[in-house]
């Protein structure tokens, strides 16, 4: 007899269910319900250290035969507590017993008296299930967490109030319990668009204000430029800068050369404001005209360079526009013409323009004059002395005038010339002293000293110690 074959079954193949008994003999062994009198398999020693695990850890449960896991006599296989098996439709997880009438209920009858205690047995587990699975199946479930409403549902449940504070003649406020999602979304989008438009308008107003301030500053600078003569730019040198005695001097020379040789990317424009030139004196108009001449020289040179690039079909740099530059040159010429007309109108009616012959006659010395002079030359010489008495006359044309640099000038103007010469000498001496100080600083700078070799010093110390 096979040891895995239950003793209360007739002998046969252990992998196949036994045939149905001919007599009303029902087995005492039900599937999944081992009886206490069935002998268990012998216990074998378990591997491990001496002493071994606790007794309950080494218990081996006898496995059921293969045929007991399948359908037997039309019953479903296994109890509901077996891991990996679907729950059974029978009460308590076991199939109905054999020999019972078909109309009799298979489960325990329900308790009729609610006051009676519950004597129902706990759920049975399959012998092969682990202790953890049995504990988890018998443990109570944790309480369910409270369900929180979503943020969207809370927003939809809030009442929406429409206020008419901006319109005093409107009807009183109305409270609506809920508003559709698309209406709320549209209102939010409209508010965002309105805020964006207001921000753009504020930025545009700020830009306009800054532009007006810049234009006003340029106009004021142009109006003040009349009293300040412009500085004439030094033409670029073709040679290399002279060698200096220090690295800083060479660096300054290189920076100066780079500034002189690089093209002028920003051209100073003439004032575009239509100012009234009549209110300025003749001297101020002359200074303004000199500034326009210097500006025109730079712009015409730059314009010729751009036109050459255009003719050679070379790409222009950013900001190079020959049309704008030509318009600026044209405006400068027109302004110079206006200044010339104003100065000409202020001259005396008897004034005549000096010709080339008149200028040569004025520059001649007495030793260069042919004597005796003819009548025509004497008449011409007398006319020039009358017109340019401050240059040709041997005596002061006005009492108190002083001869200075080939012409007669007033005493006040002579004092100003003297003060200017004194200040010029002071500035020259100060510039020379500053240059000498800079040269001393460059020469005596410790950065130009030779570096000390530490290895030689350490070697010398060791030699001295030895």
From Swiss-Prot:
Residues 160-176, 230-242 have a biased composition (Polar residues). Residues 147-159, 185-224, 243-254 have a biased composition (Low complexity). Residues 265-277 have a biased composition (Basic and acidic residues). Residues 1-25, 136-277 are annotated as: Disordered. It comes from the Eukaryota. Interacts with mdt-28. This is Glutamine/asparagine-rich protein mdt-30. The gene is mdt-30.
